[in-house]
A protein has these predicted regions:
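ABC-type nucleotide-binding domain
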Residues: 1-169
Length: 169
């Protein structure tokens, strides 16, 4: 796990956005397993990454369809495990329709913290080689943040994890 810590506007997001090639470097290189990302097909690069942006994104559909986005062949058990790691399973299970609960476009019918946890679970369900969390824990309360980081550490030992944050927690 690598943490990129700094104040607002210090370039943390710009730095990690070079990995999925949202921007290309103007000099030097960004390498994944020794290969310059500019030499990789975007599809291949994206398949290796799980990215959770600062502003969590949810799509109209259900909780289940949102968690499967990018990993449609995930088993029910894998989806449930990802939700558990992301500390989302408790609030999902409290909903009447559970994983079949409808999600409005943009996730307007869930709280900010729930939206972040669902976005995190979606990235985890993909089982990528590299997980990037770009200030993705900011809407979480302290207790949830601690539990999520602990579960993440235990479950993603073989994954390169990059966490962008404004403060150490």
């Amino acid at each position: 796990t690598v943490a990129v810590i700094g104040s607002t506007g210090s370039g943390k997001s710009t730095l990690v956005n070079l990995i999925p090639r949202f921007y290309d470097v103007t000099s030097g290189a960004v390498r994944v397993d020794g290969v310059d990302v500019r030499e990789m097909a975007k599809k291949d690069l994206c398949a290796r990454l799980g990215y959770v942006p600062q502003k969590s994104v949810l799509f109209s559909g259900t909780i289940d369809s949102n968690l499967r986005y990018g990993c449609t062949d995930a088993s029910e058990e894998e989806i449930r495990k990802a939700a558990e790691i992301a500390q989302a399973s408790e609030f999902i299970e409290e909903k009447e329709e559970k994983y079949d609960t409808p999600i409005a476009q943009g996730g307007t019918n869930v709280s900010g913290g729930q939206k972040q946890r669902l976005s995190i679970a979606r990235a985890i369900a993909k089982k990528p080689e590299i997980l990037i969390f770009d200030d993705s824990f900011s809407a979480l309360d302290y207790k949830t943040d601690v539990a999520l980081r602990r579960a993440l550490k235990e479950s993603t030992a073989e994954t390169t994890t990059i966490i962008v944050a404004q403060r150490i927690s």
